[in-house]
Amino acid sequence: MNLFSPRTGLSPTETQELLYAYTGPAPVAYGTRTRAVLENVLRPYKYFYKEENVPQALHIKTGQKGPEEISTTSPSSGFHRDSVILLSRELKAKYPEAFERLKAWIDCELLEMEYAELSKGRQTLSFLRNRNQPAPIALEETIEYLQQNLGRPIGQSMLSYLRAVMEVLAMPKTTFTYEVATNLARFDFEEYDDGETGPLMMHFEKEKKKITITITQAELWEKTCTLGTMWKHLERGRLNRRTIATPSMLARGFVKIVEDAARVLLECLPSSGVPVGGEEKLAKLSSKLEAVSEVTGELSGDQEKFNECLDPDAMRLMWTVFLEDYPQWVKELFNIPFLIFKAKIADIGEGLTYQKEGVVRVFPFGEMPSEFDELLPNAIKDKEGKIVGIRCTLGMFMGMFNLSSTLLALIAADRSEITGDHVESSDDFIHFFKAKSYDDMFKQAELLRWSLKLVGINMSPSKCILISPAGIGEFNSKYHHRDFVGNVATDLPSLVPGGKNPSSDLAMGLNVIRHSINTNQMNFISGDLALRIFTKAYRHSYMAEGITRRTKFLEAFKKDPVLLNQGAPTVHSVSTLHLDEVCLRYQMHLLGEEELRRIMNPSNPITARTEEVVSFRPEGKLPMILEDNSVGSCFKYTFTRNRTVTDKPHRVLLEKEQQYQKITSFVEECFPELTIGNTTMPGTVKQACKRRLEYIIEQSDLPTEQKRALLEEMDS
């Protein structure tokens, strides 16, 4: 069907969203995630044997297998044990300075790491409430649980926190007491003066009540191994949504240590594409291109079913080799997270969707026949016999061990037998070959593919391209042709002004275009075109484009527009992208003194510094327009939580979240230096804030009586 036919009812502009994934809002997943999770779990079992045999693969405890069992034509999960040991030793011998840096990190920085760093995560599975929660709340709850059971405070260091987790896991039974909000109905009779009773009145009172739960040792281990699964939201250019996993706070500390150690090593390896920033990645690619050889080639592509074919045991084995000269406690510490992931249980969600004669219903997994019934022997049931999770010994989930998996790929790719340079970042890679002949180069490419298969990583034949001579390739969505490296084509259409703050919207757009020109992602002609497109979008978002209510309103004043967001012609060109609009207009004598004063006046509602009003992931919250009629607040929204949440028992957690927000913003106001780096103060947070406030009052220009009154008020 022709998309532009009049029957579709779509304008050419609207069809743009159907053709190009980077315009319009990003897709959001909804509905039951069970199918996606089960597909994730089933794949590693399907790929384990050359001839698919899922029932037999379910009994596999470890992913190690012989070279004859590795499929060379299709994805293969599992790894060859001897190869992983040999390749790990080779990498260790090749980069001794990287392992010296790791030793220094383990001896010094590991001991100083604080468990508070775990609060930086996003959504985390709460093992106590079986639901996702913001990381700080989940961490606070876990600390409370540990202290209640051990009867002692937990030290600030990460190691003391992990020791407490291990102690709790060894206890035969643990308990946790927490508060929930309840709605109590009260009945009252209204009494009249003559003693008669009136109608019955009912009202609700909100009260908090305490609940105690008991967890056995087996249940706690199960909770430690359980991963919360979620849809991966806002993914552009994909037909099917994917799932990601999040471990609970019991496992997160162990994962953090292993990933931080992997980061230390990767920072020292020339073939690593992580954890460096964008500019450094571009520099790495440019430097690798300066190759002089008879035949050069460049292989760029992806690894196929990367997470499903990875095996936790392969990464555990690699780390054990890296740490063979270390004390036993270090080896055990690094083994624990991989053992947890070896026994992982995926939370499978609400159930599978079935459709018959137009009726759609969701049934829990196992109730009705499905293509995933082979996995039923691995199902985990709750006390009522309902399937809540599925055990998965092979494979991994997205979002887990990104840095360790990169390290595993590098031990196979960074071998002395393979010529040229390799850059790897999770499942994305680029390899520059230097060879004497084309035959030699093809042999090298096959050697690279087979080396990666030995550790359980599969190059995707359909997504890989080998270009000779070297000079054209793609890595991390950045395309390059010789020394030109850029990805601005995919970025530009999503650069849409928000329509909330005229000043920052304009600055943001100009910065992106300026940065693209500075880093040679665009030349001046493309930059000028991008600037014109952005200017049009900017004026459109402030209703200053064409004939709108706002343009009619401004016209009625019989006053020429002053700024771009009022409909004035743009003053920016490719050479003035770095300058602020108001300054530039004043310098060009397009703004008079009076107009400048009016714009820059701090009490002017347009430029007044207001608190940040928008705090959002808009998908989960409803916009509510604030009742504020000042000119500067025309575009102000706040996102409120759905009313149903505030009436649920979880209201206590929302109150806790609010308290955390208040206390952190209060501490930041007391200690502005916190925005730059960590500050250490003697005493508790309360004492430190009190001392700082007293100092501010004493140093101020206030009258003595007012100072005394303020200090007395603080003491009371």
Swiss-Prot record:
GO terms for biological process: viral RNA genome replication. GO terms for molecular function: nucleotide binding; RNA binding; RNA-directed RNA polymerase activity. The gene is P2. Pfam families: Flu_PB1. It catalyses: RNA(n) + a ribonucleoside 5'-triphosphate = RNA(n+1) + diphosphate. It comes from the Viruses. Its EC number is 2.7.7.48. Keywords: Nucleotide-binding, Nucleotidyltransferase, RNA-directed RNA polymerase, Transferase, Viral RNA replication. RNA polymerase is composed of three subunits: PA, PB1 and PB2. Belongs to the influenza viruses polymerase PB1 family. The keyword Nucleotide-binding applies. Residues 286-465 form the RdRp catalytic domain. This is RNA-directed RNA polymerase catalytic subunit.
